[in-house]
């Protein structure tokens, strides 16, 4: 009789244990989600993450290799260390001051023709600084020259020069490297010519500005 009661006792204990384990496994972890949603990131952490520094950035390969338009590249983008972040003055921009190259293997495909893995070199940034923007430097240089008093005629000539292209809308958000733009008229045209495409046994698609395989 005692033996039977002992087995019943252990059986009930085992059932209770497995039942509680399933309940705990099915229930969401209380506190973790609430803590993440209500967490306030400290100011210094936010500030340190925003400063100008090299950060991992996904870069379109065609941005660095615009002449490879006849190929399909896989992957089409790569992770590189590039300068990013904020500067405390709108007249400054985050630019690289130290560079180095890294070589990566990229697959190059020609539809219905061939495919091969090819080493390609990419530039990475190891050090960044906040420095005056290009248009800011132009304004500062013109102001410095005017202060030296080179004559009213030369002042007027310098004053007429403005970097017009800063007001032009980009030709294409995704494929800027395939277009060239007139800084005065903002007119867009294909960077590659039909003769260049034909030299590679391709033809120019004027809509996409890419060298493509001739249609039959």
From Swiss-Prot:
Region Disordered: start-end pairs: 140-161
Disulfide bonds: 52-94, 83-128, 87-130
SMART domains: PDGF
GO CC terms of this entry: extracellular space; membrane
Subunit record text: Homodimer; disulfide-linked. Also found as heterodimer with PGF. Interacts to the FLT1/VEGFR1 and KDR/VEGFR2 receptors, heparan sulfate and heparin.
Family, similarity comment: Belongs to the PDGF/VEGF growth factor family.
The name this protein goes by in its record: Vascular endothelial growth factor A
């Amino acid at each position: 009789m005692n033996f039977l009661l002992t087995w019943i006792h252990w059986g009930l204990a085992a059932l209770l244990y497995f039942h509680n384990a399933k309940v705990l496994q099915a229930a969401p972890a209380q506190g973790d989600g609430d803590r993440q949603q209500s967490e306030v990131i400290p100011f210094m952490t936010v500030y340190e993450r925003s400063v100008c520094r090299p950060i991992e950035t996904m870069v379109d390969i065609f941005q660095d290799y615009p002449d490879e338009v006849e190929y399909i590249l896989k992957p089409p983008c790569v992770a590189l260390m590039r300068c990013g972040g904020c500067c405390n003055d709108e007249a400054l921009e985050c630019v690289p001051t130290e560079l180095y190259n890294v070589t990566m293997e990229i697959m190059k495909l020609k539809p219905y023709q061939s495919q091969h893995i090819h080493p390609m070199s990419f530039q990475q940034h190891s050090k960044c600084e906040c420095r005056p923007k290009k248009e800011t430097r132009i304004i500062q240089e013109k102001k410095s020259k005017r202060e030296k008093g080179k004559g009213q005629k030369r002042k007027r000539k310098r004053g007429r020069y403005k970097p017009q292209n800063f007001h032009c809308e980009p030709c294409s958000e995704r494929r800027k490297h395939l277009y060239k733009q007139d800084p005065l008229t903002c007119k867009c045209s294909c960077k590659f010519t039909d003769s260049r495409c034909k030299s590679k046994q391709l033809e120019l698609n004027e809509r996409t500005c890419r060298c493509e395989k001739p249609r039959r």
